[in-house]
Amino acid sequence: LFSPQLLTGRYRDTQTSITDSSAVYRLRGDKSAAVTLIDLPGHESLRLQFLEKFKAAARAIVFVVDSVAFQREVKDVAEFLYQVLVDSTVLKNAPALLVACNKQDVTMAKSAKLIQQQLEKELNTLRVTRSAAPTSLDGSGTGGPAQLGRKGKDFDFSQLPMKVEFVECSARGSKGEEGDADFQSLEKWLAKVA
């Protein structure tokens, strides 16, 4: 849903994908500047497989969150984000990270600030749980993921080696299917990291 709307500025019906897609996005105000957007599949069983394929070349990551369903999906969202954040390649390259809180046109959508706070809390819980669990079944204890954040402190995004920002947006815009998408904050961020 996100990539077609960003490219066209208009709402378009989509379905959860099972393959990646890419397109060149021309920055507004500077048509000579462009970035290649790679949209990873939304299907949860394929996400990490495709992340593995593209993470080494990523200069930036846009992590899209459904602001309406966030409350009931917070554990799953945090789990996937945790896997991204502790990945050794992502940590080494430290690409800029934007958490795009989508569906802000819906009245019950959670704010970017609330989503950030709840993700920090849930990621902290995951970090504590993971650090207490054995790292392997064979007892070798090696090869586990990197520590998320600073030891002895509750997790917050400022502890990461990459800059993390949160923005509110809407692929549908304020007029629903007939209106323009509201990606101003996302477009500003893309121009900044391009």
Q: What are these model-predicted stretches?
A:
Residues 3-7, 18, 40, 49-53, ...:
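Short coil/turn segments at secondary-structure boundaries
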Residues 44, 67-72, 106-107, 172-175:
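Short acidic, S/G/P-rich loop/turn micro-motifs used as interaction or catalytic elements
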Residues 21-23, 31-36, 57-61, 93-97, ...:
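Core residues of folded domains in eukaryotic genome-function proteins
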Residues 84-194:
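Conserved GTP-binding G-domain of TRAFAC-class P-loop NTPases and closely related GTPase folds
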Residues 6-32, 147-153:
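Switch I (effector-binding) loop of TRAFAC-class P-loop GTPase G-domains
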Residues 29-50:
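Switch II (G3) loop of P-loop NTPases
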Residues 3-7, 41, 55, 78-85, ...:
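Amphipathic alpha-helical interaction motifs in eukaryotic regulatory proteins
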Residues 47-74, 78-91, 97-101:
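Inter-motif core of Ras-like GTPase G domains
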